[in-house]
Amino acid sequence: MKTKVGFNRLDRKSSHRKALLRNMVISLFRHEKITSTKAKLSEVKRFAEKLITRAKVDSVHNRREVSKFIHDKYILNKLFTRISPIFKERKGGYTRVIKLGQRYGDAAEMAILELVDKTLEEKQ
């Protein structure tokens, strides 16, 4: 019997894990780059890719579905008006994980998660 198959639970209860992932996704869309442990970023990447794919088609339904996960109206608007148009022709792979090595204190594997295309400031 297989157990714990499907996703990384990050050693947290479900409500804490959801809040952590939501806050990290919002930070990614706000700053376009975040630094954390590799395990956290690989989970954040899953959610960010799904949200960007959903935001590529700007409809009322898609805005409501994305707003279930992103509660910040500024970030929601930024996702639909500034981030998703950059990725219109791209089929997937909107983010990249760059490994940084181990953290000094506890030897945790650190990484950077960033949006693939050039930053939004350079595009405008």
UniProtKB/Swiss-Prot annotation:
Give the CC-aspect GO terms: cytosolic large ribosomal subunit
Statement: the UniProt record of this protein carries the keyword Acyltransferase: no
Does ATP-binding show up as a keyword for this record?
no
One GO MF term = structural constituent of ribosome
Pfam family example for this protein?
Answer: Ribosomal_L17
The alphabetized UniProt keywords are: Ribonucleoprotein, Ribosomal protein
Sorted alphabetically, the Gene Ontology BP terms of this entry are: translation
- Cite the record's note on assembly: Part of the 50S ribosomal subunit. Contacts protein L32.
Mind telling me which NCBIfam families this protein's record contains? L17
Q: Which family does it belong to?
A: Belongs to the bacterial ribosomal protein bL17 family.
**Protein name in the entry:** Large ribosomal subunit protein bL17
> Species name for this entry?
Borrelia turicatae (strain 91E135)
- Write the gene name: rplQ
